[in-house]
């Protein structure tokens, strides 16, 4: 939808209706200058694909996905790939029971220090290569068992 909007800096999506969306892949792909994004109002209950959703958002520092419902998502590959300025990411409400692909999910998040993935379930995942590749500053990881 906003894929390759390279000069997009700000966007208000508070009234955006996503209740029928099943594919959010590449939604903000390569939005190089986007710094803050509040998606707390997004209805993601029907979404199956979130691959590369924020990939290449090099300037993204703050991202609110606190109300995402990920119970039907199957693909999260490269979701945050290249979000190199993000220091903290709270995915506390992400449930990943149906996810099969998480490869390169956080690849290149070189400034990521805190990550909350407390409800991640890797039972059905068959691709997880490079998931934390390049996350050299990651010091706080909250995960399940």
Give residue spans per PLM region.
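Predominantly recognizes leucine-rich repeat
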Residues: 3, 29-31, 55-57, 82, ...
